[in-house]
């Protein structure tokens, strides 16, 4: 896609404020990068697509002991993506939101994201509350 510095700035800002191990960057040639990663064998490539195998069947086989690249499919995903991916996984076989597919996949693969320890190091901490907003601001040291 096209480079959008504002998207990267937003994601990096959210990570800085709320914590957690998240990184992002613009890749000018994503298919070349995916090919290199596929050939290296050092990462697992997971392609989320409505044409893949059911997520409940695929997830137990996806290794957790090496980095993963999750490609969220859409109408413009090159056909080659299906061939270089280690797993083509569907969250449903009907059109659906790519963000929803990613959320379902990540929750099932890495587990619940609502544990406070998953997002340490942030300036802001949201405390679960049945009513209203409870936020703790951590002062920088």
Q: In which residue ranges do the predicted regions lie?
A:
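S-adenosyl-L-methionine/SAH cofactor-binding core of RNA-modifying enzymes
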Residues: 8-77
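General "foldedness" signal
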Residues: 36-38, 59-62, 102, 119, ...
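Compositionally biased, intrinsically disordered low-complexity regions
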Residues: 54, 123-124, 134
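General N-terminal targeting signals
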Residues: 62-64, 88, 106-107, 141
């Amino acid at each position: 896609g096209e480079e959008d510095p504002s998207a990267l700035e937003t994601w990096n800002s959210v990570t800085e404020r709320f914590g957690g191990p998240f990184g992002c960057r613009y890749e000018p040639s994503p298919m070349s990068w995916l090919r290199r990663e596929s050939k290296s064998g050092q990462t697992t490539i997971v392609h989320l697509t409505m044409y893949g195998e059911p997520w409940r069947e695929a997830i137990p086989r996806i290794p957790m002991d090496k980095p993963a690249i999750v490609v969220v499919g859409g109408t413009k995903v090159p056909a080659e993506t299906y061939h270089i991916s280690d797993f083509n996984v569907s969250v449903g076989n009907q059109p659906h939101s790519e963000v929803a597919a990613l959320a379902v996949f990540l929750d099932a693969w890495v587990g619940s994201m609502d544990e406070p320890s998953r997002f340490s190091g942030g300036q802001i901490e949201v405390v679960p509350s049945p009513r209203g907003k409870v936020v703790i601001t951590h002062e920088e040291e």
